[in-house]
Amino acid sequence: MSDDWVEIYTDGACKGNPGPGGWGALLIYKGVKRELWGGEPDTTNNRMELMAAIRALAELKRPCKVRLVTDSQYVMQGINDWMPNWKKRGWKTASKQPVKNADLWQQLDEQVNRHEVSWQWVRGHTGHPGNEQADLLANRGVVQAKRQPIV
């Protein structure tokens, strides 16, 4: 990977679905690592996967070339297959239903448009160092979320 690229590894976690959830992201640029995490007391795993990518991309101060690595098929399919049609249909599915998590998909779309993003899927929990670190961070977010009041 060229030094011009920012590498981002993201993951989401949820204890119960819905339940307390966390997101984590590892950003690497020119050998410097930055860890981000957070959580919500009542959420879903898919929302946390999306939040990880959104928050990581939003952290970048200027437009960048990004390689974003995720273990989420939901995020990969959404970004590559579903989103173009959702946008054409006014954020509706093929069956004319509102897109689930449209608020986050729209935020992700906004962030992706700021950067040049190359998406890569990796299988989770297979020892990939960046993905494993993102998983640890997401679980840190779950612990944080469990301490937050729901109201």
Swiss-Prot record:
Gene Ontology molecular function, alphabetical: magnesium ion binding; nucleic acid binding; RNA-DNA hybrid ribonuclease activity
The protein, known as: Ribonuclease H
Subcellular location, record wording: Cytoplasm
Cofactor dependence: Mg(2+)
PROSITE patterns from the UniProt entry: RNASE_H_1
Enzyme Commission number: 3.1.26.4
Catalytic activity: Endonucleolytic cleavage to 5'-phosphomonoester
Main subcellular location of this protein, as a coarse class: cytoplasm
Chain ranges of the RNase H type-1 domain: 2-143
Gene that produces this protein: rnhA
Function: Endonuclease that specifically degrades the RNA of RNA-DNA hybrids.
Keywords: Cytoplasm, Endonuclease, Hydrolase, Magnesium, Metal-binding, Nuclease
InterPro entries xrefs: RNase_H, RNaseH-like_sf, RNaseH_domain, RNaseH_sf, RNaseHI
Subunit description: Monomer.
UniProt keyword Ribosomal protein present: no
